Curated annotation (Swiss-Prot):
UniProt organism field: Mus musculus (Mouse)
Name of the protein this chain belongs to: Zona pellucida-like domain-containing protein 1
PTM comment: Proteolytically cleaved before the transmembrane segment to yield the secreted form found in the extracellular matrix of the cupula.
UniProt-listed GO biological process terms: vestibular reflex
Keywords, sorted A to Z: Cytoplasmic vesicle, Disulfide bond, Extracellular matrix, Glycoprotein, Membrane, Secreted, Signal, Transmembrane, Transmembrane helix
Length: 415
């Protein structure tokens, strides 16, 4: 009997004249089916997590938008979604603000992952994973002929960002250095600034930074004496706070450097500094804003040995191999991965007057010597041709006028 009822319900749903989808933006030929995994889209945004569920398959299953709720909170209207019928197909949208994560029972799990070139606790990063589900209520009866719907979602963010997503988060690393007379611990920090004075830390507006805004970064060390300097080996960016993200863009590594990146100071003092112009990751093409996280693989080196660790770029020859054998084991520390972000960028506006923005104006057209000579020659040639044309016309005019005058001997016959 149950099978008969189920077949009857399916027959009603797929009938051509069915008013099942009402006025919603659905296609009976495409959406007369039960939901599948592809019917939910999850967007891990910079300020909120957004889920979009295919509403047409929800209708086909016998439910309405009020039957869907976050984490079984069907009695709380704040945990329900809303319909957007301006898309195809129509969708039910759920939005979770990062500032109110636990309002509808979402689950937050903190995990610790190693960074690039991990060296103990000095290179660990804490990641917060937010997960939950959207489902339909259980029927009050013992049995039901309607399928239960369940959609799962998950997003990961740096823990510092979840704690206060209105400010930039920067990580610090405690790095130990062994010397002949013992071991000391120094703390490294990666900070972002507004300009080259390195006085005011970078503030990200709620709408994000325009593309090509210049950002200044600094790695600073504490508890160091004058014998040790900071050396940045490798700095790169990722779209997430995970320094091991497969999607990354290198700013500088050895002699390879992004054209928009300028290394101001490295290996010469207890602070490393550089600047770069912000961009967006292509994977965020469907979003108005993009997140950029900065990571730097950093170490400490003795002031006398830092020049030996610096790459030799350009046409100069590589240092003699003997100079590389003079390092003692305690000449450098272990590596530490420092992170900062998110740097939120927007792509819907063009930078205008802003002291922090890179100049986007088109440079005035300038002529080089060769181009100027060619243009001058063409002008002179044109003037000569025009003068010759005028002279030719003048000669033709005089010849025509002379031919009209009749000269000769007087004929006596006509007298």
């Amino acid at each position: 009997m149950e099978r008969v009822w189920l077949l009857f319900l399916l027959a009603i749903r797929v009938s051509p004249g069915s008013a099942q989808f009402n006025s919603y933006n659905c296609d009976a030929n495409l959406h007369s089916r039960f939901p599948a995994e592809r019917d939910i889209s999850v967007y891990c945004g910079v300020q909120a997590i957004t889920m979009k569920i295919n509403f047409c398959t929800v209708l086909f299953s016998g439910y309405s938008e009020t039957d869907l709720a976050l984490n079984g909170r069907h009695g709380d209207s704040h945990c329900r979604g809303f319909i957007n019928n301006n898309t195809f197909p129509a969708v039910v949208i759920f939005i979770i603000n990062l500032s109110t994560l636990e309002g509808c029972g979402n689950n937050l799990v903190v995990s610790t992952i190693p960074g690039v070139g991990a060296s103990g606790n000095a290179t660990t990063v804490q990641i917060g994973n937010i997960s939950g589900y959207i489902d339909t209520p259980d029927p009050p009866a013992v049995i039901s002929y309607l399928p239960g719907l369940l959609y799962k979602f998950s997003c990961s963010y740096p823990l510092e960002y979840l704690v206060n997503n209105t400010q930039l988060a920067s990580s610090s690393a405690a790095i130990s250095v062994r010397e002949n007379n013992g071991t000391f611990v120094s703390t490294l920090n990666l900070l972002l600034y507004n300009d080259s004075t390195y006085r005011e830390q970078l503030i990200i507006p709620s709408i994000g930074l325009p593309l090509k805004t210049k950002v200044f970064a600094a790695v600073q060390a504490t508890n160091l004496d004058g014998r040790w300097n900071v050396l940045m080996d490798y700095c790169y960016t990722t779209p997430s706070g995970n320094p091991n993200d497969d999607t990354r863009y290198d700013l500088f590594l050895s002699c390879d450097k992004d054209p928009q990146t300028t290394v101001i100071e490295n290996g010469r003092s207890q602070r490393g500094r550089f600047s770069f112009e912000v961009f967006r990751f292509v994977k965020h093409k469907n979003q108005k804003m993009s997140t950029v996280f900065l990571h730097c693989l950093t170490k400490l080196c003795r002031a006398d040995d830092c020049p030996l660790l610096m790459p030799i770029c350009g046409n100069r020859k590589r240092r003699d191999a003997q100079s590389w054998t003079t390092w003692a084991p305690q000449s450098t520390s272990g590596n530490a991965v420092l992170s900062a972000g998110p740097i939120i960028t927007r792509s819907d506006e063009t930078p205008t007057n802003n002291s922090q923005l890179g100049s986007l104006s088109v440079p005035p057209f300038q002529l080089n010597a060769v181009t100027s000579s060619l243009i001058s020659g063409m002008v002179i040639l044109g003037v000569l041709c025009f003068s010759l044309l005028l002279c030719s016309l003048a000669l033709l005019h005089r010849k025509g006028s002379t031919s009209l005058v009749l000269n000769g001997v007087r004929n006596p016959v006509f007298e």
